[in-house]
């Protein structure tokens, strides 16, 4: 084994002994040691370039043995309380787990090194003597090592000799690498700093100055000293290895300080403006920086700015002395106000994260908030109460820090009243009704303003009134009606509507000055502006229909003519404007009985008047004849029955001769009588009668007569001798006899006597007388007519006693007729003679018994005139005259024509003709037609009649400028003077309408006609009682086009075209639309339709739409409109909300592009109507046709039919909600009952998170049953991710974001009412009702904010 081995064994034995001693030193009651030994052998090669003068083999390399001693002290035996604090501190100064002590022993000769490492647990044994025991153990180990060294020296003596003796001469000690072996001295010559037999012991300088122990060349100094040679005083904690110890004081390295260099030095020693604490300056107030050299800013600018000269220069978005406050918004302004919204704008910094808008009614109430992104500069607060003043504050928010608010006090407008309608409209009143408000306000103000802004009325009403009847309006006036809500000093926006009062008709209708054929109608004109006045009149009972006149306003009277005398009429008057007609005012009147016409005296005598007149048109039963002298002393009345035929005759008798009578004749009918037809007629003066010669002499003739009975002034006697020189004498009226004297002897005198009164002179009585004796010499014939003759003769002288007159036709002399005459008679009238017959007449004077020779004469009666003249076939320029022929033969007829111009034409008609037509007359002219017969040079008496030619008719009546509702009538005026034209307009569906046009016009515009209607127009002219012939024309109005063609709801590819139908019946419409690019399309639309939606249009294109109505082969004129389709706001919509903003307003299946990428398209069902539309429907249950009890894979990708029941897929939910913030709506229905649940946030995480559900705040009517599932992963029958003991999906036959297990189970079994098995929403129908209809839908949250449909309350 050798010395080396022995040494090793010995050393190990010694160490073991010492450990045993250590164990014995620890009392069992105090500590128990467990020692384990680990021996590690390692080989090292130390080369110190050139230090060794010999090369050694591997076995000469030093051997190092490491001994590790783990001393484990059981805790339960090391727990006394006597451990000193200092010992505890020493033990804990280094490692918190083990105290490690290392020692090394080297065998310099054998190149073996023993390393000893002892591990002791620190604080494992808090015994009172543990520290002391350990210290003693260390000392013993050191002592042991010194003893081993001495022992080794003894064992190594004569190593060379031993080697030589054993024959091992190749072994040379290494001298520990710190010297050279000398065979001469058989020992090592050590290098400087080393000593010992094998140079393995370092040399301690100065022998450690007697202040320590040299161990392995190093001084282990006493506790007060240090240094290589223990000559230096020790510094506290050896300056903590952070400085030099100089004379016991530490000269610390930078940046340390303190007596033991434990403390960090502060920069610049805090510039004298602070205290240094562990290297950090605690600056005085007002200073800052690493060295307190800088002026300090308050709160170090809160980390949101930099300090400059003690002042904080804040980052954008912050303000305040320490930059702790967020900069508030600026310039808060109100951009718009409505009744339920306020639009705000402000200016703010760019760094703002978001804005919080807080608003609350100023009178108190719920404070609500709204948050908007920080890049917004405005917001619209919606769903406010109308008419309230709100305190509004806007905060800027950065990193959840709110700024001071900028505030405003803003009042919402009062709401616009809704539902304005008119219940009752009359001429002067309008009853208005509107819907009430649900909020408090002061009252209403309603105003009626004429469209011309002239005048108007305003009324204020209580707030609980929602209807009002306004009186005192103007008829036919269009009013703008405004209803405004009032609150305090505020006025809401008005709701307006226009209404026109009913046009008033004429009032106070009065019929005056009614005559037999004319009635004068007066009325008070309507106050409204009207197009015309419609006057209708006709017989009561409807006989003959009604005549209608259109009269132009402001006419307020009209003379109705050509009435039937003695008839009961009804007249009504209304006003017309456009198609509106007022109520008619009507009254009845009876025309007067027309007076007899053409009153005339046939013959007259001194005591009688023969009267004749034309009968009245009225059905009079009799006539009342009233007559009296002009003095009116006494009235006489005679009732005369109506004569048969056109005339009635009567004779007034017992009249006063020579007196002028006033005669009035009235027609009498049913106790009523007409105005009288009057005339004055004078009776003849009563002639002195019975003029006789009572005596005669050669120079005188005595006369006697009967006194005239009437009033006269005197008598005038005219006597004319045969010499021809007449003489007159006036005799007072009271005389009845007179004697003419101084006459010529033997002369024949013609003596006549007349009674005179003023200029009136009676018929004369004549007598022939002779001075001396003279018989009747001859007969005088006068007044010869066709049936009578007047015979006169002279007085016989002396006068005869009686006279006998005989006469007979010449060929019938044997049948002479005799007439006895009084002797005083000097004339006689033979009546009843035959026309054109020669009569023989003789006169005999009887004197006593002596009869004179007869005086014979002959006379031929005249030819008789035509009889019964009548007029017929009267036209404007001709008439027909007919008559009965006379009895006597004649040659021809002659008729003169008295023209209005005064010219008299005469024409001859053969005697064989009894009817003749006279032509070339003037229209509307009065003619006197007379007719007599002529034989040779003899003419008969004339028969006469008066006649008016008819008016000539207007000519060339035509209708021009014909439109669907209008036509222009034109004509040529007749030759005669025209007062009015009467136009009668008729069509198949309406009775004739009569229009009165002024006589100076030659055209008339027809309006308000019916489209596509055939009209007949008849027309005649009137002038007084004359009416022209009728002319007529026909025309048809055109087919009217559709009206109000408009384009609305214009989107990118569609437009709604609507119109109002024409008035005429049609078969269909022809609609043509064309674009600017030249494309054109024609559609046939049913007649019942009034709108059509054009689909498939091009975007951003101008379109022209043409529409016309069609009936058979007829088409109306074109009506047109223009519109422009819109463009797509989003070319690749990523959700339904963007489709909606693109103008897609119909619910249905659409394609969305996730994140706007063409490669990520997805078919979805869009709900475009619910709550503003724009929802992606991602689940629907409605009929149970689709099985929802499926596995994980199905729920990931989705299943079902988008038009029916379906699940869109969890992957799709995640991809959609990852695009931004979405909101969720769940609609549920049970029959007519419908509820919804709304959550302002909705997201589904990805597959790695098992599609966890994230939802926001709830609102709605269904109750919040979904928040229970917040944050839960999705579970299916094959993926149980719930927290329940059972598999919820398996138990409840569904798949959901189950927890333990559910409060809503919208994917449960359809129609299953067992507890929790069906489609459940706990807060609405509980767990035992399966909801028959469910839709889950989502849309971007921003859509609600921009649409402003729902107000949300948000917390700070």
UniProtKB/Swiss-Prot annotation:
Coiled coil: 127-157
Gene source species: Rattus norvegicus
Paired cysteines (S-S): 297-307, 314-323
Phosphoserine PTM positions: 723
Domain Fibrinogen C-terminal: start-end pairs: 1127-1342
Induction: Transiently increased in dorsal root ganglia 1 day post-dorsal rhizotomy, returning to comparable levels 3 days post-injury. Increased in dorsal root ganglia in response to both sciatic nerve crush and transection injury.
NCBIfam families: GGGWT_bact (NF040941)
Boundaries of every EGF-like domain copy: 188-199, 204-230, 235-261, 281-292, 293-324
Name assigned to this protein: Tenascin-R
Subcellular location: Secreted, Extracellular space, Extracellular matrix
Location of the Fibronectin type-III domain: 328-419, 420-504, 505-596, 597-686, 687-776, 777-864, 865-953, 954-1040, 1041-1129
Xref: InterPro entries: ECM_Regulatory_Proteins (IPR050991), EGF-like_dom (IPR000742), Fibrinogen-like_C (IPR036056), Fibrinogen_a/b/g_C_1 (IPR014716), Fibrinogen_a/b/g_C_dom (IPR002181), FN3_dom (IPR003961), FN3_sf (IPR036116), Ig-like_fold (IPR013783)
Family as reported in the entry's similarity comment: Belongs to the tenascin family.
GO CC, one annotated term: collagen-containing extracellular matrix
PROSITE patterns: EGF_1, EGF_2, FIBRINOGEN_C_2, FN3
GO biological process: associative learning; axon extension; axon extension involved in regeneration; extracellular matrix organization; locomotory exploration behavior; long-term synaptic potentiation; modulation of chemical synaptic transmission; negative regulation of axon extension
Entry keywords, A to Z: Cell adhesion, Coiled coil, Disulfide bond, EGF-like domain, Extracellular matrix, Glycoprotein, Phosphoprotein, Proteoglycan, Repeat, Secreted, Sialic acid, Signal
MF annotations from Gene Ontology: integrin binding
Tissue: Brain-specific. Expressed in oligodendrocytes and small subsets of neurons (mainly interneurons and motoneurons) of the cerebellum, hippocampus and olfactory bulb. Expressed in dorsal root ganglia.
Origin superkingdom: Eukaryota
One Pfam short name: Fibrinogen_C
């Amino acid at each position: 084994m050798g010395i080396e081995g022995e040494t090793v064994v010995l050393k190990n034995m010694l160490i073991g002994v010492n450990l045993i001693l250590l164990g014995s030193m620890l009392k069992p009651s105090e500590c128990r040691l467990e020692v384990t030994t680990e021996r590690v052998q390692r080989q090292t090669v130390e080369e110190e370039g050139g230090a060794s003068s010999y090369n050694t083999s591997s076995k000469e390399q030093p051997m190092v043995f490491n001994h590790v001693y783990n001393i484990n002290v059981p805790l339960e035996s090391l727990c006394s309380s006597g451990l000193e604090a200092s010992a505890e501190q020493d033990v804990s100064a280094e490692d918190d787990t083990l105290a490690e002590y290392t020692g090394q022993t080297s065998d310099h000769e054998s190149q073996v090194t023993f390393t000893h490492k002892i591990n002791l647990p620190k604080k494992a044994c808090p015994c009172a003597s543990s520290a002391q025991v350990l210290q003693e153990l260390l000392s013993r180990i050191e002592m042991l090592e010194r003893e081993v060294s001495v022992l080794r020296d003894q064992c190594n003596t004569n190593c060379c000799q031993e080697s030589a003796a054993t024959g091992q001469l190749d072994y040379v000690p290494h001298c520990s690498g710190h010297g050279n072996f000398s065979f001469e001295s058989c020992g090592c010559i050590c290098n400087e700093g080393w000593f010992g037999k094998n140079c393995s012991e370092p040399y301690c300088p100065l022998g450690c100055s007697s202040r320590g122990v040299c161990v392995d060349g190093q001084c282990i100094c006493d506790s007060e000293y240090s240094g290589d040679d223990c000559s230096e005083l020790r510094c506290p904690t050896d300056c903590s290895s952070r400085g030099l110890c100089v004379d016991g004081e530490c000269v610390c390295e930078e940046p340390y300080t303190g007596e033991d260099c434990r403390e960090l030095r502060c920069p610049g020693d805090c510039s004298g403006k602070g205290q240094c604490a562990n290297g950090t300056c605690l600056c005085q107030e007002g200073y800052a920086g690493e060295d307190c050299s800088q002026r300090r800013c308050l709160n170090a600018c809160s980390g949101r700015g930099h300090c400059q000269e003690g002042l904080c220069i804040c980052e954008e978005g912050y303000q305040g002395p320490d930059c702790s406050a967020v900069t508030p918004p600026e310039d808060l302004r109100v951009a718009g106000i409505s009744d339920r919204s306020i639009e705000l704008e402000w200016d703010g910094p760019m760094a703002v994260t978001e804005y919080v808008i807080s608003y609350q009614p100023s009178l108190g109430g719920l404070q609500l908030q709204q948050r908007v992104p920080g890049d917004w500069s405005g917001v619209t607060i919606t769903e406010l109460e109308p008419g309230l003043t709100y305190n509004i504050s806007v905060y800027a928010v950065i990193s959840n820090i709110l700024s001071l608010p900028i505030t405003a006090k803003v009042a919402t407008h009062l709401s616009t009243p809704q539902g304005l309608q008119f219940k009752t409209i009359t001429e002067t009143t309008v009853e208005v009704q509107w819907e009430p408000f649900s909020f408090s306000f002061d009252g209403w103000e309603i105003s009626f303003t004429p469209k011309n802004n002239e005048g108007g009325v305003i009324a204020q009403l209580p707030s609980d009134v929602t209807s009002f009847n306004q009186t005192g309006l103007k008829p036919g006036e269009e009013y703008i009606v405004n209803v405004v809500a009032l609150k305090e000093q505020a006025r809401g926006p008005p709701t307006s509507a226009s209404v026109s009062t009913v046009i008033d008709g004429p009032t106070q209708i009065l019929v005056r000055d009614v005559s037999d054929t004319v009635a004068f109608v007066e009325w008070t004109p309507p106050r409204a502006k009207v197009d015309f006045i419609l006057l209708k009149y006709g017989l009561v009972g409807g006989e003959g229909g009604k005549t209608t006149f259109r009269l132009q306003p402001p006419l307020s009277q009209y003379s109705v003519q050509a009435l039937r005398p003695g008839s009961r009429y009804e007249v009504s008057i209304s006003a017309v404007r456009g198609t509106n007609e007022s109520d008619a005012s009507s009254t009845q009147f009876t025309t007067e009985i027309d007076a007899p016409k053409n009153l005339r005296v046939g013959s007259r005598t001194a005591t009688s008047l023969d009267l004749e007149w034309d009968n009245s048109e009225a059905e009079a039963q009799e006539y009342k004849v009233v007559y009296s002298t002009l003095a009116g002393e006494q009235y006489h009345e005679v009732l005369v029955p109506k004569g048969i035929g056109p005339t009635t005759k009567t004779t007034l008798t017992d009249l006063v001769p020579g007196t002028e009578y006033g005669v009035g004749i009235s027609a009498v009918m049913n106790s009523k009588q007409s105005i009288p037809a009057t005339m004055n007629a004078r009776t003849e003066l009563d002639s002195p009668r019975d003029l006789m010669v009572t005596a005669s002499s050669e120079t005188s003739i005595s006369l006697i007569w009967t006194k005239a009975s009437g009033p006269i002034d005197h008598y005038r006697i005219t006597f004319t001798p045969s010499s021809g020189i007449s003489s007159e004498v006036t005799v007072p009226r009271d005389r009845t006899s007179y004697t003419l004297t101084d006459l010529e002897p033997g002369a024949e005198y013609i003596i006549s006597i007349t009674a005179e009164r003023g200029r009136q002179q009676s018929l004369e009585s004549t007598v022939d007388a002779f001075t001396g004796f003279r018989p009747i010499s001859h007969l005088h014939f006068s007044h010869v007519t066709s049936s009578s003759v007047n015979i006169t003769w002279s007085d016989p002288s002396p006068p005869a006693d009686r006279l006998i007159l005989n006469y007979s036709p010449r060929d019938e002399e044997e049948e002479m007729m005799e007439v006895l005459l009084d002797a005083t008679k000097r004339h006689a009238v033979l009546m009843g003679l035959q026309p054109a017959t020669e009569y023989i007449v003789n006169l005999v004077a009887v004197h006593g018994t002596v009869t004179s020779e007869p005086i014979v004469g002959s006379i031929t009666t005249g030819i008789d005139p035509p009889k019964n003249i009548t007029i017929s076939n009267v036209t404007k320029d001709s008439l027909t005259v007919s008559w009965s022929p006379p009895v006597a033969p004649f040659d021809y007829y002659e008729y003169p024509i008295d023209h209005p111009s005064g010219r008299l034409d005469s024409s001859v008609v053969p005697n064989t003709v009894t009817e003749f037509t006279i032509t070339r007359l003037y229209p509307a002219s009065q003619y006197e037609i007379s007719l007599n017969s002529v034989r040779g040079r003899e003419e008969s008496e004339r028969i006469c009649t008066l006649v008016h030619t008819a008016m000539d008719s207007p000519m060339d009546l035509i209708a021009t400028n014909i439109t669907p509702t209008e036509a222009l009538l034109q004509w040529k005026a007749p030759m005669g003077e025209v007062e009015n034209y009467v136009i009668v307009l008729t069509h198949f569906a309406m009775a004739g309408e009569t229009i009165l046009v002024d006589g100076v016009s030659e055209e008339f515009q027809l309006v308000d006609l019916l489209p596509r209607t055939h009209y007949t127009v008849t027309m005649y002219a009137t002038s007084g009682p004359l009416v022209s012939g009728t002319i007529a024309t026909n025309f048809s109005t055109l087919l009217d086009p559709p009206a109000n063609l408009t384009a609305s709801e214009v989107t990118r590819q569609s437009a709604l075209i609507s119109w109002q139908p024409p008035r005429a019946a049609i078969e269909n419409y022809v609609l043509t639309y064309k674009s600017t690019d030249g494309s054109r399309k024609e559609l046939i639309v049913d007649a019942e339709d009034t709108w059509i939606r054009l689909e498939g249009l091009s975007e951003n294109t101008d379109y022209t739409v043409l529409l016309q109505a069609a009936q058979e082969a007829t088409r109306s004129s074109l009506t047109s409109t223009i519109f422009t389709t819109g463009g797509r706001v989003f070319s690749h919509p990523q959700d339904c909300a963007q489709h909606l903003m693109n103008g897609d307003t119909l619910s249905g299946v659409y394609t969305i592009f996730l994140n706007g990428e063409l490669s990520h398209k997805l078919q979805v069902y869009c709900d475009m109507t619910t709550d503003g539309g724009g929802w992606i429907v991602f689940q629907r249950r409605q009929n149970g046709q689709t099985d929802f009890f499926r596995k994980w894979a199905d729920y990931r990708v989705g299943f079902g039919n988008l038009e029916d029941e379906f699940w869109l897929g969890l992957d799709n939910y995640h991809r959609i909600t990852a695009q931004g913030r979405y909101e969720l709506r769940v609609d549920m229905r049970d029959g007519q009952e419908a509820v919804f649940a709304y959550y302002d946030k909705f997201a589904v995480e990805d597959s790695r998170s098992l599609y966890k559900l994230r939802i926001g705040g709830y609102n709605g009517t269904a109750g919040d049953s979904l928040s229970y599932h917040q944050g839960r992963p999705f579970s299916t029958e094959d993926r149980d991710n719930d927290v329940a003991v059972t598999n919820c999906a398996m138990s409840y036959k569904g798949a959901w974001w189950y927890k333990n297990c559910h409060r809503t189970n919208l994917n449960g079994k359809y129609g299953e009412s067992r507890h929790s098995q069906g489609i459940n929403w706990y807060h609405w129908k509980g767990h035992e009702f399966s909801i028959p209809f469910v839709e889950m839908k989502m849309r971007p949250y921003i859509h609600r904010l921009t649409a402003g449909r729902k107000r949300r309350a948000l917390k700070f």
